[in-house]
């Protein structure tokens, strides 16, 4: 009866927004079911080898299709790709990010152009471009690569819990 348990987070991360301009703010969240792994796992499983072996972009995109569902217009299964069929603009964005990955990889903010930092943060450009693309095709976006100013929940259980429940800045 004397125990009080408090659970909270120190910050919210990512700033998830529902609705995206290129989908007219509609959502297609089932697209996200095609993502089979995190960007970090994709980096360690695939991208590190692409860099080492100088893998051609089209070959890398076969792994992107298998792990994220994003499909090139030239793919034999393009007619079945639905909302995950890439536009020419998206292909060029992915190609640019891929070439930057092979040439430079990730970098600190001080060593990047403002444009590259806004596009990729300090992460591997190709993986970030993949994630941005599937997010945007799904109708979601993230406002930051880091902490946000959003308030966090505080959960409480036990003696005096009613004094601690809520959302706090």
Each model region followed by its residue ranges:
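A post-motif C-terminal structural segment
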Residues: 1-169
């Amino acid at each position: 009866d004397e125990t009080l348990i408090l659970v909270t987070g120190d910050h919210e991360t990512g700033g998830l927004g529902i609705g995206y301009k290129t989908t007219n703010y509609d959502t297609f969240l089932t697209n996200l079911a095609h993502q089979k792994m995190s960007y970090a796992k994709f980096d360690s499983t695939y991208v590190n080898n692409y860099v080492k072996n100088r893998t051609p972009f089209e070959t890398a995109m076969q792994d992107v299709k298998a792990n994220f569902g994003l499909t090139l217009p030239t793919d034999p299964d393009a007619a079945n790709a639905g909302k995950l069929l890439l536009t020419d603009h998206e292909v060029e964005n992915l190609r640019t990010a891929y070439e930057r990955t092979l040439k430079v990889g990730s970098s600190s903010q001080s060593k990047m152009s403002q444009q590259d930092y806004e596009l990729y943060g300090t992460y591997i450009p190709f993986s970030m471009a993949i994630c941005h693309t599937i997010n945007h095709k799904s109708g979601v976006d993230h406002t930051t690569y880091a902490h946000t100013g959003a308030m966090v929940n505080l959960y409480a259980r036990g003696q005096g819990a009613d004094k601690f429940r809520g959302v706090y800045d």
